[in-house]
């Protein structure tokens, strides 16, 4: 569970009562392991922070068959600024957020679009194998005259 001081550094973006994204601000800083996703998500995201000298035991991961129905992707902003526009599953604009260097977003469900606000370098992580055109439905972004940042 996040402490009160950490809550502002981690935001859950809800659309129509469903969790569509988790944003972890560059300011988030807590010792130990903090998972931000429930166990049933097909993409897990956690913060791990330890003092110098901490030993993490060597390990391998066992083969476990999993079924993935939706692609969930994590974006790690290394440099620059990126606006993320969030859409409902019905492709209707709902809200936007601006990410900066050091921020991380896990895109869970719903639609999303992006505008690069400052020269950007980011890393994307998502499940594979890539399904090509079957993996996504592209749509025309209909943005309101004034974006929402609630």
Residue ranges: model-predicted function:
Residues 113-150:
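Double-stranded beta-helix
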Residues 88-109:
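Short acidic-glycine-tyrosine-enriched beta hairpin
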Residues 58, 84-85, 105-107, 112-117, ...:
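Short beta-strand His + acidic residue motifs that chelate non-heme Fe in jelly-roll/DSBH
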Residues 47-69:
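Conserved short histidine dyad/triad with adjacent acidic residue
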Residues 51-52, 70-87:
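Glycine- and acidic-residue-biased ligand/ion/polar-headgroup-sensing regions
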Residues 1-47, 142, 149-150:
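A short, N-terminal "cap"/entry segment at the start of jelly-roll beta-barrel domains
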Residues 64-65, 90-92, 121, 129-131:
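Short, surface-exposed beta-strand-loop junctions and turns on beta-sheet-rich folds
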